[in-house]
Amino acid sequence: MSNHMLVERVLKLIKPIVDNLNFELYHLEFKREGNNNYLRIFIDKEEGNISLEDCEAVSRAVSDILDREDPIRDPYYLEVSSPGIERTLYTHEHLKRYIGFNVIVNIQGLLKGKKKYQGKLLSFDESVLRVSCEGEEIVIPKSKISTVNLKDDL
């Protein structure tokens, strides 16, 4: 089973549980690092920060169905956490939520001689992101973007 198919299968199993606990399933990934497999669940909520207790509650709740349905044949470690302050913005919903916030856009290759742009996220559509960098609007083709992360302004 491909990694994408595995993530989709796990997503279908755990999303209703995470939703029922009043958390947002922000992101889900399955990765091999060294000799170990990791299923990482990133949760968020509308108000306040994610606590250790929140992560424990989600971990306990999803462990039951993962053990019962057994979608992952190989041994793995389950990790549940917040997406963090400088979270990656994966989806259109994530981008929409953080319009007006400072972001770091990492570029594949170079764009106007740079590998990275930092500035305020102005807007986006299907093909480009618009970021205000030092007073100049930069239009970045999505095809050139490696990652977009929130910038910690603290």
Curated annotation (Swiss-Prot):
Key words of the record: Cytoplasm, Ribosome biogenesis
Gene Ontology BP annotations: ribosomal small subunit assembly; translation
Function: Required for maturation of 30S ribosomal subunits.
One of the record's GO cellular component terms: cytosol
Recorded family membership: Belongs to the RimP family.
Name of the featured protein: Ribosome maturation factor RimP
InterPro entries listed in its UniProt record: Ribosome_maturation_RimP, RimP_C, RimP_C_sf, RimP_N, RimP_N_sf
